[in-house]
């Protein structure tokens, strides 16, 4: 491959969005893309296209005095920034260095200490609760404790300075945790809801701690829905105080103590999210108001007005009239991770990487891009990947990086949530957006930003695999329902715009982890995140008629859940989540080959067919399968892609492969001798 000088000059730009932010978000990257042969031989060429997606991704924010503290997301190392509102500059930061994201921030009543709780992919045996002394911001935050629940999702500090934490770990019901700053001890106070899978909200008064849980992740299979418990600090006992109207929602999402009231919100699923205001003196006395959003979070208050964020923007709730109203804002706020009401103004922190200072009375706002203000713009872990002859796309949090394959220019596009998987058809990008965002699209010839193409039932919230069916001109998307269990197959016609959601096409427990297509038939690979029930079922499905054609149960050694599927000729290739490999002859509907590839593929994987060869990628290795013997060969060893939610590989129309090596996007041109 011959490189031009333009390929050596890579620029990272922020695409002009609804807020008109189009300034450079990072320094020039002058290192040229490198092509080199690998151990697989001279027929394999790897081109480094630079960082997949660079931004200051964030997951939490809290205003203390005149400074907003912001927790990072999927960046290494984890850190908290201090954004000074009067100067609109990042004036300090502290590196925590543990985990991948910071979702929980809370300040003690004096405003001196900021507590931060982290999320981890695996228990590192290190503190997951940190404290930063804001009087000496030049000194780093220190780890002060570790809960046995791996992830901390929310923190609250009682008036006496005692810290309470909630969160969870897969396979275990969440507990309420207490950190005593006087003794330095972390204590488990109990598990109030043994059927909950995650706790996301906590609030505390002098006498009571409120614990909000449910099953935002890992729903179904008997998991509980939204639950609210009051913990008596003196007696050490829990009491269920969940408003009955909220019990259908999958989870309590947020809690706020305002004077003598407790404000409670939920995440919605089959119904919209709800907001309740409860009397602290008599928790059976409350007002409850449905919203139009899928989630209500980031509760804050000014006098009798409660402000909150939903998936559609900002809203206010009047305690006097019990009326919810939108808060005017000229632009797209995206996914909101911080909201504070101070002095009649709102401070909004968006997942798009900006801080907005908003006057709710007039709708006027001042918006500051965090990259321009001094936040580090660095590579984050990646999600879906797609490419054509001109552009390659890498999904991230609240953004998609567009790589110009001719010039090397990289532009960050705005898209709320997460682009879990994507495809490019005739130059147009199509994505499956988590959570409950449906399908989005972007046409570079038309410019602008990505926009929603089609919505689907909100409970079918997690798209996992996007596939194109050229026979029926359909986009096929395999989906998981985090809250209800099971999943669905979405279809969208690129010709007519018609859409459909086929709920639980495998069974009531299995989600659709993978989708492949041949001759107008969709092949669905099942997976089951629960401990019970079948997993790994393969279903042949007519996506036009919306009906099953036949199904196949895999051999017992392969029933660990499907990770990926691909079709070559009459053969359906499949990988399981523990490295099991199988080939199905679609003409006789039978497994004709199996193998154990745990050595190179110990967990999640992705596959794609390119130039008549099926390729796969794991967390560690890019590999191919021989089309006649099905033997596995390594293409790129130790590729070690930095993925947020499982590896991806895709191909452009010329058959070149795109995946991640570390946090960099790479193009792999492989011409094996078959």
Please place each PLM-identified region on the residue numbering.
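N-terminal secretory signal peptides
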Residues: 1-7, 15-34
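A short helix->beta-strand "capping" segment at the edge of beta-propeller domains
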Residues: 38-54
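Residue-level signature of beta-propeller blades and closely related beta-rich strand-turn architectures
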Residues: 74, 120, 169-170, 214-217, ...
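Surface loop/turn motifs at the tips and blade-to-blade linkers of beta-strand repeat domains
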Residues: 49-54, 94-98, 144-148, 190-194, ...
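Beta-strand-rich domains and repeat architectures in extracellular enzymes and scaffolds
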Residues: 49-78
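Structural motif
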Residues: 77-81, 124-130, 172-177, 219-227, ...
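Blade-level signature of beta-propeller repeat domains, shared across WD40, Kelch, NHL, RCC1
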Residues: 643-674
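Repeated scaffold domains used in trafficking and secretory/extracellular systems
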Residues: 55-60, 99-106, 149-156, 196-203, ...
